[in-house]
Amino acid sequence: MKFKKQFYLLFICLWAGITKTTFAQQPATYDYVVSSNGKGNFTTIQEAINAVPDFRKKQTRILLSKGIYKEKLVVPASKTNIALIGEDGAVISYDDYSNKLNVFGETKGTSGSSSVYLYAPDFYVENITFQNT
């Protein structure tokens, strides 16, 4: 009887280990990596967005490495199905405001002072702070 209990206990432990190994989460894969220190495919987010093929049917996954990226982004309508995923500490920052003057000496206004212009469908963002400084 004692042997039978030990056998069942061993079986359950082995089964749990196999199940955990079989169903373990696979590491995320990315098409592009943006890193301000030059260790990725690009040093700016806009470069990575520009590199995405127009009207791509499959999702393009872009990893944004930890850091502060001071840039104004434009995501054209042709850059479909993009997922922009940040590491902890990924920040997109820009310092426009509505009364700031443009190159013609006119105020930009609210719609002209956006930090991100998003025209593309199916754009997904995860774990990124958008900061207006």
Language-model features, listed with the residues they occupy:
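Bacterial Sec-dependent N-terminal signal peptides
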Residues: M1-P27
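Acidic Gly/Asp/Thr-rich repetitive segments characteristic of extracellular carbohydrate-active
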Residues: Y32-L63
